[in-house]
Regions:
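Boundary at the C-terminal end of the N-terminal hydrophobic targeting segment
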Residues: 30-32
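Exposed beta-strand and adjacent loop surfaces of beta-rich binding modules
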Residues: 34, 48-52, 121-123
Length: 167
């Protein structure tokens, strides 16, 4: 008996893939917007500060790193809340690092965040540390809501004010 290879319709899986991609692209979860975070540092009289800005969900679970200011990895452990929470995130530093921020200077970074995260109990946190000075875990905690956009939050030690803007 001569068996022929069975002919398959290759367009069916392709159509399913395209339909799924379109559904995700047009779902509310797929829409995102730039969020600009600005942190104005105090004139605290020390070396440049290391800062870690990261996102927490409504249950207090780490979601992702938004930015890390300060390039020497050996000092990242001083950003203690972020360091502990993000330890399992292999991508935590991919494309989100820059120089430390000097006393009296401003850090301004932009990250894309899904619209579904806004007004859903999420929070932006910033840890801060400076050489030979106290570490300041969760220096600033800002609820990610439309009502808090543009409202300055005061830091505990190094940050004069921190705000975020929704674009």
């Amino acid at each position: 008996m001569n068996k022929r290879p069975r002919k398959t319709n290759m367009s069916q899986p392709l159509l399913t893939l395209v339909a799924t991609a379109c559904a995700l692209a047009f779902s509310p979860l797929a829409h995102s917007r730039p969020v600009t975070l600005t942190a104005q540092l105090k004139n605290y009289g020390g070396d440049g500060a290391y800062l870690a800005a990261y996102l927490m969900d409504a249950k207090g679970v780490y979601v992702r790193t938004l930015w890390v200011a300060g390039g020497k990895a050996k000092y990242h452990k001083h950003l203690s809340d972020w360091y502990k929470l993000s330890a399992g995130d292999a991508k935590r530093l991919n494309g989100v690092t820059g120089a430390s921020v000097g006393a009296g200077r401003t850090l301004k970074v932009t990250a894309d965040l899904a619209d579904a995260l806004i007004d859903a109990g999420y929070e932006i946190r910033i840890d801060a540390a400076a050489e030979d000075m106290r570490d300041s875990p969760s220096e600033v905690r800002i609820p990610l809501s439309k009502a808090n956009a543009g409202k300055p939050q005061t830091g505990k030690q190094y940050i004069q004010s921190a705000t975020f803007q929704l674009q």
